[in-house]
Amino acid sequence: MFSRAVRLSRAALPIRVASQRVPIAARRSVTTNAAQAQVDKSTIPESEDEPFTIRLSDESFETYELDPPPYTLEVTKKQLKQMYYDMVVVRQMEMAADRLYKEKKIRGFCHLSVGQEAVAVGVEHAIEKTDDVITSYRCHGFAYMRGGTVRSIIGELLGRREGIAYGKGGSMHMFTKGFYGGNGIVGAQVPVGAGLAFAQKYTGGKKATVILYGDGASNQGQVFEAFNMAKLWNLPALFGCENNKYGMGTSAARSSALTDYYKRGQYIPGLKVNGMDVLAVKAAVQYGKQWTVEGNGPLVLEYVTYRYGGHSMSDPGTTYRTREEIQRMRSTNDPIAGLKQRIINWGVATEEEVKGIDKAARAHVNEEVAAAEAMAPPEPTAKILFEDIYVKGTEPRYIRGRTLDEVYYFN
Amino acid sequence: MKRSTVVIRPSARALSRQASSQSFLLARSSALTSRQRRLYSTHPPNARLNLPIDYATTPLLAHTSQAALSNPELPASVRNGTTKRMNLFQAINDALSTALAEDESVLIFGEDVAFGGVFRCTTKLAETYGGDRVFNTPLTEQGIMGFAIGAAAEGMRPVAEIQFADYVFPAFDQLVNEAAKFRYRDGAGGRSAGGLTVRMPCGGVGHGALYHSQSPEALFTHIPGLKVIIPRGPVQAKGLLLAAIRSNDPCVVMEPKILYRAAVEQVPTTAYELPLGKAEILKEGKDVTVVSYGQPLYKCMAALKAAEQDFGVSVELIDLRTIYPWDKETVFNSVRKTGRCVVVHEAMVNAGVGAEVAAAIQEDPETFVRLEAPVARIAGWSIPTPLVFEQFNLPDVTSKCYLTLGLADVYADGMPRDIRRHQKGDEFLRDLSMNSGILKQSMLHSSRRGVDWLMGIVLDDIILSVFLV
């Protein structure tokens, strides 16, 4: 089976652009360099909205029983700037969450996606609002990209009523239109995603579901159960393993017999993507969506990415990997720095303009975070505690943990 | 949402009454400040009863070596030995280390256990006993459990860790259909998964929300073939865990995660077992029996102290320790003596351990005829664990319960203590109609006392002991 995969991926090679840097015989792997895409500068139009073609690195993808996506991508200046803006906002938002957590304003479990921004942003720029996304607990970036506001996400982390899930879910459980969470149980979202895809197919329309899970979750039995159903019923499901190399503190090689997660679908074609390059992610998901809505069934993607921080706020993230490794990824493979470099090199925007985008994103996040912090804490009422669970009128008539001096009383 | 405080809104009528009293308003304003700070459901400010548990002084933990070694359940050799100060995770680590050292067939595995585990229970075990006996698994709960059952069936003694009890559900099938039924279905073949021990942290932690604060113990008590054990502190954890590992039945050991660091006591250094399926009477009393297990025991202790002081009642406190199969004899004997029983647990009230204990008590003719009040349950509401409102769900010191027929009363934190059992009990019983609805009665009564009920909020300032009329 695997030899066949290797053969196929070699057979696909001629499709790629001419400049092969790696000998065909050598085992190739996807790069995590975020700044390898190229463009013929003379083709870049003046207009913000006129598309032009960029050429992705030939190390952007690896495939399994699948012809690789085109190594070219049509973008506009405006789109590039928007992607850059979105990634900066997501990172700033995560940094704000980090700060608020350290100030003890956010409590509980909190998982940040600093370093992985290109996946959330690239996916959203490749799909429509009518498509669905479901992901794991590292979900802030996706919630934002799906249409959640920064204030509603930070508000949620702070447990406020105006939070995106009414302050009831916190970090791991965020939902918005077209976004089904945020799930605290490792792998549980994957079969749910298959169900979403089934409903999309059933109701018609060219819609797909993007289902994300981590390299740790990929060993959960229900992931494979979902694969089988999706292939059996030819569902428009884009399974996607966000491989950030570590499931909590266990590296992929220590937890997985086969670390080529894009081959994990066995009977489902796979596509491994440079998850540090937002353009490669966009190209891959765009291609995957087209492929699946044309009735070709599901696809298993693997986004090769990296989280700079620990697994959660209680994990410094340095006990199971070296500081050098983190530093190297940060300094050479950063998705935001990579896109920034290309935007400037290609003349899509001047350094000043990019700085302006940075500033605008930061100002936006600061403003939104301030608004979230200013939200009133939830009223400790029985209504909030019991809503959406008990039939009206059957709720317990009191809540616990209160003392008499916390109410007004007369007499 | 312009309102800047978290107060429960007074009615217009109440407000106008307040406005008429300037001094009253002034008095409230200082309380408002403390309210504003209470963004999370932390301990109430100015509380007299719902104070943080002081683990350093609670009589439920052995603070001295002497106290630890005087435990009559320990064999003489242990009682003549020494003790060491440990918290719950260190005691568990000690038990696991002992088991690994004494029996080659003991294995420990689970998510991140080789690094010491997220709660540090397996610290240094991999270094000491080698990576082939203590190892990490992929994130695959169903796989972990099935793997453990297979190993146990071959005679190993696997100790599988599920990182949080909330994650156990994918493994539920393996526990219910494989582990619990193995011996039964193999019959004369004689094979079983008896060497299996499953450990998992459970219970509230302050902010665990949907998937990190649940207490699913009752689900396992529904399965014949499993033993379900919940220790309340380090001494117990060591003895019960060792007993579970050595036991020839599959055991589920649920560790209240909030106690991992909080509960510290002197633990005997040598290996010892505490009996499975045996409850422990923590305090003797004659008026009411309180049955609980795990972390709520500490709250029960605080509540019964307050009750004894305020109402002059005498409360017996029983720690079930093993919640399935549980020690009916000890509980029945106690209830036959006191005539009243309250079961307290964090897990939601419906179909919980409380239901089972209450049903068993009323089924037992000898105990039933001694009952002077319905068996009461104080447990979590039937809701998913809230994120910021966790404390509003968990039983607290002043949780309401109705122990006597039709009697509900209100005892408010900070209110004058005039409803003393010996003064008013009989009167109240006569006053309150049996079928008029407990709540309504309590509301009427509270209104008289000036509590604002108009928002439908009834404060939980109701101490269980009031009902021991």
UniProtKB/Swiss-Prot annotation, chain A:
Residues 1-29 form a transit peptide. GO terms for biological process: pyruvate decarboxylation to acetyl-CoA. The 10-megadalton pyruvate dehydrogenase complex contains multiple copies of three enzymatic components: pyruvate dehydrogenase (E1), dihydrolipoamide acetyltransferase (E2) and lipoamide dehydrogenase (E3) and catalyzes the overall oxidative decarboxylation of pyruvate to form acetyl-CoA and CO(2). Within the complex, pyruvate and thiamine pyrophosphate (TPP or vitamin B1) are bound by pyruvate dehydrogenase E1 subunits alpha and beta and pyruvate is decarboxylated leading to the 2-carbon hydrohyethyl bound to TPP. GO terms for molecular function: metal ion binding; pyruvate dehydrogenase (acetyl-transferring) activity. Thiamine diphosphate binds at Y137, R138, G184, V186, D215, G216, A217, N244, H311. Its cofactor is thiamine diphosphate; Mg(2+). Keywords: Magnesium, Metal-binding, Mitochondrion, Oxidoreductase, Pyruvate, Thiamine pyrophosphate, Transit peptide. Pyruvate binds at H111, Y137, R138, G184, V186, D215, G216, A217, N244, Y246. Its EC number is 1.2.4.1. It is found in: Mitochondrion. Mg(2+) binds at D215, N244, Y246. PANTHER family: PYRUVATE DEHYDROGENASE E1 COMPONENT SUBUNIT ALPHA (PTHR11516:SF60), PYRUVATE DEHYDROGENASE E1 COMPONENT, ALPHA SUBUNIT BACTERIAL AND ORGANELLAR (PTHR11516). Eukaryotic pyruvate dehydrogenase (PDH) complexes are organized as a core consisting of the oligomeric dihydrolipoamide acetyl-transferase (E2), around which are arranged multiple copies of pyruvate dehydrogenase (E1), dihydrolipoamide dehydrogenase (E3) and protein X (E3BP) bound by non-covalent bonds. The Chaetomium thermophilum PDH complex contains 60 E2 units, 12 E3BP units, about 20 E1 units, and 12 or more E3 units. The units are organized in 1 E2 60-mer, 4 E3BP trimers, about 20 E1 tetramers, and a maximum of 12 E3 dimers. GO terms for cellular component: mitochondrion. InterPro entries: DH_E1, PDH_E1_Alpha_Subunit, Pyrv_DH_E1_asu_subgrp-y, THDP-binding. It catalyses: N(6)-[(R)-lipoyl]-L-lysyl-[protein] + pyruvate + H(+) = N(6)-[(R)-S(8)-acetyldihydrolipoyl]-L-lysyl-[protein] + CO2. This is Pyruvate dehydrogenase E1 component subunit alpha, mitochondrial.
Swiss-Prot record, chain B:
K(+) binds at G194, L196, T197. Keywords: Metal-binding, Mitochondrion, Oxidoreductase, Potassium, Transit peptide. Its main location: mitochondrion. The keyword ATP-binding does not apply. One of its GO terms (biological process) is response to nutrient. InterPro entries: THDP-binding, Transketo_C/PFOR_II, Transketolase-like_Pyr-bd, Transketolase_C. Residues 1-40 form a transit peptide. Thiamine diphosphate binds at Y167. It is found in: Mitochondrion matrix. One of its GO terms (molecular function) is 3-methyl-2-oxobutanoate dehydrogenase (2-methylpropanoyl-transferring) activity. SMART domains: Transket_pyr (SM00861). It is an enzyme of class 1 (oxidoreductase). Its cofactor is thiamine diphosphate. Its EC number is 1.2.4.4. Pfam families: Transket_pyr (PF02779), Transketolase_C (PF02780). GO terms for cellular component: mitochondrial matrix. It catalyses: N(6)-[(R)-lipoyl]-L-lysyl-[protein] + 3-methyl-2-oxobutanoate + H(+) = N(6)-[(R)-S(8)-2-methylpropanoyldihydrolipoyl]-L-lysyl-[protein] + CO2. Heterotetramer of 2 alpha and 2 beta chains. The branched-chain alpha-keto dehydrogenase complex catalyzes the overall conversion of alpha-keto acids to acyl-CoA and CO(2). It contains multiple copies of three enzymatic components: branched-chain alpha-keto acid decarboxylase (E1), lipoamide acyltransferase (E2) and lipoamide dehydrogenase (E3). This is 2-oxoisovalerate dehydrogenase subunit beta, mitochondrial. It comes from Chaetomium thermophilum (strain DSM 1495 / CBS 144.50 / IMI 039719) (Thermochaetoides thermophila). The lineage of its organism: Eukaryota, Fungi, Dikarya, Ascomycota, Pezizomycotina.
